Amino acid sequence: PAYIVGIGYGKGWEHASRTRCADLTPSQPDPATLAGLEASPLTKGATYGEAERYHRFMTEELRPVIEAGYPVSRSDRTLWGHSFGGLFALHVLFHHPEAYRTYLVNSPSINWGGGAILGYESKLVAQLEAGKVAPRVLLTAGEYEERLADHIKPYPGVTREQMQAALTAFAMVTNTRGLAERLKAAKAPAGAQFQAMIFEGETHLSAIMPAMSRGLRFALPA
């Protein structure tokens, strides 16, 4: 059996939107991104860059509670995250790869802070090539996270050209696939696994469901 633990906030969508900005980001946004976030009532006034604190909460406070109440494995844990959650999962993978056996990284915001998270990729590669860690990592994204399909309407007040330019700049598919390919090229020990899946016909939001389905099969092989 597997135990699935979800972490929520319980104080309304605006509170959750602001709090996740702090909890799930490892660094500050670039000025242009910050301006856009400040223009939204859901994220205006949010703080950022507290991913390490949130990781400590999960491992030092939440994990002991789970282990005390359920017969969970201490050697076969999985971390799943989408969007900012995917960025958070990469932060943990790069800085604390031993914290989880499997990482399910869906539509990660790799471009956050000018792609600052990729500056720590080499830390993981060094540990892989030293034979110190052997994580299993599935990176996923939706096909239409980088290409605006004909049947998808852009946001109100935004032209198709502007929307496509934004998707191109985010480079979700390119970044996700590229990271998986680089990690696969590392001389990792037996047991390590790196895989990318791009879901045909899916957007940033609709990619969540196939990511969960394929992620469960990846984390819990028969």
Q: Language-model segments: which ranges?
A:
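Non-catalytic cap/lid and distal C-terminal segments of serine-dependent acyl enzymes
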Residues: P1-A222
